[in-house]
């Protein structure tokens, strides 16, 4: 056993200078690529981190849709179900009078707290809830894809099939693809009833974003049962289920509703010619996002908007 002095005198570490040069080049590239990154904490290599790191946005279509409602009178409140590390709230939440975030994953919740403080200040008034909403009060196991913190889901009571849950994150071998945590779930109807009764004034107009990987129906039904008739909302939510019954969804709400799918119209060319796309882009071609009203026979998979 060496003593401390012997260890100090014997210490030596060598490295490959070629590897050092490669690393320095990568660091320069990283600094260049991330010069417009969002001022938030994200996890390197995670599926939800690429856009915030590279150009400071997350889901541009969703953020712009929320902004469109916020700047046109729907700015009284924002409810963010499945807030994760706070990307939607932090990048689209400025301008709402009240913000309520819900995130059951305790690991992610700590990052959410930090990102909210970075964005809204230490003395922020954003309400952060370290629990999710479902069909009752319980402790459930959260399944977390190792390469996508944003894809975590509750298997118990999930409305998605196992194939959908695997496919949405491109999981081929589930045996080593996930981590697991026990999380707190509270009854959707009870909690939302209290929220709309005591914390959101009557007559308010706001935005609700739901990204809870197969638990959306529980929250949507609870909103329908508890939303005051004087309030109006734009509900943005994700759907991976091709058999999603939006007619049943509309029946939850005892009032007029309209359902849309957010669709991307990118710049295209014949035969997917990349050079032609570059030329068109240099000449000013622009891609677009638009809302298409959903009919009975249309594919409901994608980012949806329910106007109530």
Language-model segment annotations:
Residues 244-257, 261-266:
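C-terminal substrate-binding/active-site "lid" region of AdoMet-derived donor-dependent transferases
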Residues 82, 209-213:
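Conserved S-adenosyl-L-methionine
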Residues 1-125, 165-182, 189, 193-204, ...:
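S-adenosyl-L-methionine
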Residues 89, 96-97, 206-207, 216-243, ...:
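A short alpha/beta connector and helix-capping loop motif
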Residues 139-147, 156:
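Polar, low-complexity loop segments and adjacent catalytic/binding residues used for recognizing
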Residues 61, 87, 106-107, 149, ...:
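Short alpha-helical
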Residues 133-135, 188, 212, 239:
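Hydrophobic pocket-lining residues within nucleotide cofactor-binding pockets
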Residues 130-131, 182-185, 209:
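Conserved residues in the N-terminal Rossmann fold of short-chain dehydrogenase/reductase
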């Amino acid at each position: 056993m060496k003593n401390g002095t012997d260890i100090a005198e014997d210490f030596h570490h060598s490295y490959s200078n070629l590897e050092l040069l490669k690393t320095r080049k990568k660091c320069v590239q990283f600094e260049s690529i991330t010069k417009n990154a969002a001022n938030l904490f994200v996890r390197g290599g995670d599926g939800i981190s690429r856009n915030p790191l590279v150009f400071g946005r997350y889901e541009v279509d969703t953020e712009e849709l929320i902004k469109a409602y916020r700047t046109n009178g729907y700015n009284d409140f924002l409810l963010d179900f499945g807030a994760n590390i706070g990307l939607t709230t932090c990048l689209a939440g400025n301008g709402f009078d009240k913000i309520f975030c819900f995130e059951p994953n305790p690991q992610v919740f700590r990052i959410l707290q930090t990102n909210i403080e970075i964005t809204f200040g230490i003395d922020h008034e954003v309400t952060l809830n370290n629990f999710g909403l479902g069909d009752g009060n319980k402790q459930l196991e959260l399944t977390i894809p190792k390469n996508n913190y944003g894809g975590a889901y509750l298997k118990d009571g999930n409305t998605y099939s196992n194939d959908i849950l695997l496919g949405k994150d491109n999981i081929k071998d589930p045996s080593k693809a996930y981590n697991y945590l026990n999380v707190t779930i509270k009854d959707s109807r009870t909690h939302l009833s209290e929220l709309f009764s005591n914390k959101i004034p009557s007559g308010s107009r706001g935005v609700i974003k739901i990204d809870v990987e197969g638990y959306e129906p529980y929250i949507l039904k609870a909103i329908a049962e508890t939303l005051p008739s004087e309030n109006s909302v734009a509900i943005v939510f994700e759907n991976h289920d091709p058999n999603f019954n939006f007619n049943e969804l509309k029946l939850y709400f005892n009032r007029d509703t309209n359902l849309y799918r957010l669709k991307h119209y990118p710049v295209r060319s014949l035969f997917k010619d990349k050079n032609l796309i570059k030329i068109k882009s240099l000449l000013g071609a622009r891609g677009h996002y638009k809302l298409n009203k959903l009919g009975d026979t249309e594919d409901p998979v994608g980012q949806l908007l329910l106007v109530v």
